[in-house]
Amino acid sequence: MIGKRIRIERIINRKTDRTVIVPLDHGVSIGPVRGIIDMAGTIDEVASGGANAVLMHKGMVRSGHRGYGRDIGLIIHLSASTGLGPDPNHKVLVTSVEKALKLGADAVSVHVNVGSEREPEMLIKLGTVAEICDDWGMPLIAMMYPRGKKIDDEHDPEVVKLAARAGAELGADIIKTNYTGDPDTFRDVVKGCPVPVVIAGGPKIETEEELLQMVSDSVEAGGAGVAIGRNIFQADSPANMTGAIAGIVHDGLSVEEAVRILKGGE
């Protein structure tokens, strides 16, 4: 499908088949936290650092997307819930593939909390959006997170494998999910999923070196890169953090080499 191939090349590096995506969609769920207040400034930093794409809600495109400088892919997030709602794990569709196309999006994303009480409704929406994406040639990223009463550990390799595979089975072109904690078990997740898998950053990680090690381990295991938000946009220097991560993902840098970029070296 030529439309999907063209658009995917705007968010995935064609030379490495990997990507560095920076999600900036957190404002709906947790409000205007540090790092996403000045959207244009943050996007400028992550673009200069080498991010392949940013991900945001429809209303923020006019506030932050590029009109200058280095080009960067645009992913529109179709799902939302607030932290104040009765069930924050229930993600609803708040816009459409057609609207994303009108905004100039290179891809769309849908969030599914696998194992939550409202999982069936979210799966229906994912499958429906996947079919519409096929009709329009629009790449679809499925954010597949294991969350629910039956799930004791959201990073358990077995539940992450199931979540990733479910997203691919329902038509996603790229899966975003949790890292399992070590390369061996994450390699099984990648093997079990026929489309590229990128890891989420999750809550703010304690040390930058720990984050970079996780990125390195995930690509070593066959991961297709990262979709990391808070650990990039709340870094002391989002540009340097993006550059360090991109160096690992695309250039094969070691963690030690990436730390030098993070600290402002070359």
Swiss-Prot record:
Q: Does the keyword Amino-acid biosynthesis apply?
A: yes
Q: Does the keyword Manganese apply?
A: no
Q: Which residues carry out catalysis?
A: D25, Y145, K176
Q: Keywords assigned by UniProt?
A: Amino-acid biosynthesis, Aromatic amino acid biosynthesis, Schiff base, Transferase
Q: Where does 1-deoxy-D-threo-hexo-2,5-diulose 6-phosphate bind?
A: D25, H26, G27, V28, S29, Y145, P146, R147, G201, G202, G229, R230
Q: Which example biological process does GO assign this protein?
A: aromatic amino acid family biosynthetic process
Q: Where is the signal peptide?
A: none
Q: What is its EC number?
A: 2.2.1.10
Q: Which reaction does it catalyse?
A: 1-deoxy-D-threo-hexo-2,5-diulose 6-phosphate + L-aspartate 4-semialdehyde = 2,3-dioxopropyl phosphate + 2-amino-2,3,7-trideoxy-D-lyxo-hept-6-ulosonate
CDD domains according to UniProt: DhnA (cd00958)
List the Gene Ontology MF annotations in alphabetical order. fructose-bisphosphate aldolase activity; hydro-lyase activity; transketolase or transaldolase activity
Which InterPro entries does UniProt cross-reference here?
A: ADH_synthase (IPR010210), Aldolase_TIM (IPR013785), DeoC/FbaB/LacD_aldolase (IPR002915), DeoC/FbaB_aldolase (IPR050456), FbaB-like (IPR041720)
Q: Which family does it belong to?
A: Belongs to the DeoC/FbaB aldolase family. ADHS subfamily.
Describe the function of this protein. Answer: Catalyzes a transaldol reaction between 6-deoxy-5-ketofructose 1-phosphate (DKFP) and L-aspartate semialdehyde (ASA) with an elimination of hydroxypyruvaldehyde phosphate to yield 2-amino-3,7-dideoxy-D-threo-hept-6-ulosonate (ADH). Plays a key role in an alternative pathway of the biosynthesis of 3-dehydroquinate (DHQ), which is involved in the canonical pathway for the biosynthesis of aromatic amino acids.
**Quaternary arrangement and interactors, per the entry?**
Homodecamer.
Which PANTHER family does the UniProt entry name for this protein? 3-HYDROXY-5-PHOSPHONOOXYPENTANE-2,4-DIONE THIOLASE, FRUCTOSE-BISPHOSPHATE ALDOLASE CLASS 1
Which NCBIfam families would you find in this protein's record? Answer: ADH_synth (TIGR01949), PRK07226.1 (NF005556)
What is this protein's name? 2-amino-3,7-dideoxy-D-threo-hept-6-ulosonate synthase
Please name the source species. Answer: Methanothermobacter thermautotrophicus (strain ATCC 29096 / DSM 1053 / JCM 10044 / NBRC 100330 / Delta H) (Methanobacterium thermoautotrophicum)
Q: What is the lineage of its organism?
A: Archaea, Methanobacteriati, Methanobacteriota, Methanomada group, Methanobacteria
